[in-house]
Amino acid sequence: MSKRILLTNDDGVYAAGIRAAYRSVSDLGDVTVSAPAQQQSGVGRSISIFEPLRITRTTIDGIEVHAIGGTPTDSVILGIFTIMKELPDLILSGFNIGENISTDTITTSGTIGAALEGASYGVPAIAASLQVTEEGLKFDDLRDFQHDFDVGIKFVNGVAKKVLKNGLPENVDLLNINIPHFVEEDSEVEITRLARKFFRTGVEERRDPRGRPYYWIAGDLIHTAEKGTDVNAIEKGHISVTPISLDATSPINFSEIEHLM
């Protein structure tokens, strides 16, 4: 029986990255594409509970897709329970245009949020992201994003093939894959842990023509991190693979908390 794969992202169903992701798994089984109709970066694992959702079926570059009027997590939920009507064997979220590394992105990335939603149903999940060297590229029209995805496609294909055959190791719900911008066929692969920080958060205040203030959440990237982290791997030009668990319980002796009670 052919494997069933659900493909989603957070950059939107028309983004170049999801077409590359489709190429990475199209030979591994039946691929269902269910992704946001609009750009949804930074929404994390949010779901729409105060408005109805609509599905638009269309074809993009010969690929049948389902454009969801909601978040990446909405897209996974509708993909499983309305479109496929069964659990897939694998969920792939990506390729995100922009790296998703450090604890900063685990809770804010729609790419990772969608993968975590699938993982919550016991489905092995992969999130795949591509580093960009200019931050502004993340905010451009990603339909026409130009990049050679071939190395990333080949790498994700190999990982997905093995996950479909063997599943994920115990206590691993998601593999967070980040591909460096200048990746090569022989680029080193590192199994990494999450760096603590990647962004130095700030707020920029501006004034509208009437003199009233408005604000942009901004900040700079942090380019230094401990050895063994995803940020460090990407800075070295290595492919980063971080195993993620849904269980966010701190691995400490609970007696250390008792004095706070």
UniProtKB/Swiss-Prot annotation:
One GO CC term, this protein: cytoplasm
UniProt remark on cofactor binding: Binds 1 divalent metal cation per subunit.
Primary localization: cytoplasm
E.C. number: 3.1.3.5
SUPFAM superfamilies the UniProt entry points to: SurE-like
Protein name: 5'-nucleotidase SurE
Enzyme class: hydrolase
HAMAP family: SurE (MF_00060)
Coiled coil spans: none
Binding site for a divalent metal cation: D10, D11, S41, N96
Membership in a protein family: Belongs to the SurE nucleotidase family.
Its biological purpose: Nucleotidase that shows phosphatase activity on nucleoside 5'-monophosphates.
NCBIfam families xrefs: PRK00346.2-1 (NF001491), surE (TIGR00087)
GO molecular function list: 5'-nucleotidase activity; metal ion binding; nucleotide binding
Cofactor(s) of this protein: a divalent metal cation
